[in-house]
Amino acid sequence: MGINFDVSRPKARSSINMTTKFHTIGLIGKPHHQGTNQTLKRLHHWLTMQGFEVLVEERVAAELGPNIEAVDLLEIGARCDLAIVVGGDGNMLGAARVLARFDLGVIGVNRGNLGFLTDLPPDAFEEALAKVLDGEFDTEHRFLLEAEVYRHGMLKASNTAVNEAVLHPGKIAHMIEFEVYIDDQFMYSQRADGMIVSTPTGSTAYALSAGGAILTPNLQALILVPMFPHTLSCRPIVVDACSTIKMVVSPDNGENLEVSCDGHVHLAVLPGDEIIVRRSSERLRLIHPKGHNYFHVLRTKLGWGSKLF
């Protein structure tokens, strides 16, 4: 059953508490998801009644009813000073790759599974969000990766990633051969199913499942995690975030290789191509409720043991 709010026009901005850090708020969510739509409707109504200017990402705006200002992600980035993403970490990652180029805060309402990046509960967000809007929040910057594919010295494709850039064999799993260089220094050759280059943000995602270490978000580091290497001695390695990672694909590999950015964007790779992964100049400005504790998040999301004494 849908929720039918009678949404009136925003009040004058002068009605907003003068300590408020935000004035124009963008709402982003997972399209065609009933729970997300209900939360977005509540958010839109609640924010509008408090006098905020509210923009809604166009993919979900049509499902929220009339009197909604629908815009794309780029316009949210340009016009808003806060974006609220309703969904799971995948929705947050997709929005973050676009919004990181703008100077706005981003906070998440969890409508997914784990929700490492989405702090607010979907059914009781008002109290915590009210404090955030009154200026009681912690800010955390997360750097992104830039992944580039070169063919015969020419740039063929590029994109950014919040979590990780992954070299892999495409749709059919099989072993591939490649060399890895750190700052143009040869590190090793690999025969493996691929390679994960992860940020600290991504170290609790795909890299963790592949046996990588957890990096705290404030670390300026990257972790390289081989995927099912055909050796007994290969281990993940952590390098400085300023390092340039180069992977050279053997010309003897088959075709249809890919580099995936956060599992969303796929860059085609051919035998002999070079993949460059480095830290992007863009940063995501995450907003957390005051007192956010990263290790508490790890305990609750990953099921770590409770304190014994």
Swiss-Prot record:
GO CC terms, sorted: cytoplasm
Q: What is its main location?
A: cytoplasm
Pfam families attached to this UniProt entry: NAD_kinase, NAD_kinase_C
Reaction equation(s) it catalyzes? NAD(+) + ATP = ADP + NADP(+) + H(+)
| Annotated positions binding NAD(+) | 89-90, 163-164, 174, 191, 193, 204-209
Spell out the subcellular localization from the entry. Answer: Cytoplasm
What Enzyme Commission number does this protein have? Answer: 2.7.1.23
Mind listing the UniProt keywords for this protein, alphabetically? ATP-binding, Cytoplasm, Kinase, NAD, NADP, Nucleotide-binding, Transferase
Instruction: Name a GO molecular-function annotation.
Output: NAD+ kinase activity
- Active site (record annotation): 89
**Which GO BP terms sit in this record?**
NAD metabolic process; NADP biosynthetic process
Needed cofactors: a divalent metal cation
InterPro entries, per database record:
ATP-NAD_kinase_N, ATP-NAD_kinase_PpnK-typ_C, NAD/diacylglycerol_kinase_sf, NADK
Q: Which NCBIfam families match?
A: PRK01231.1 (NF002306), PRK03378.1 (NF002893)
The family this protein is said to belong to = Belongs to the NAD kinase family.
Q: What does this protein do?
A: Involved in the regulation of the intracellular balance of NAD and NADP, and is a key enzyme in the biosynthesis of NADP. Catalyzes specifically the phosphorylation on 2'-hydroxyl of the adenosine moiety of NAD to yield NADP.
> What name appears for this protein in its UniProt entry?
NAD kinase
Give the organism, scientific name.
Answer: Shewanella baltica (strain OS155 / ATCC BAA-1091)
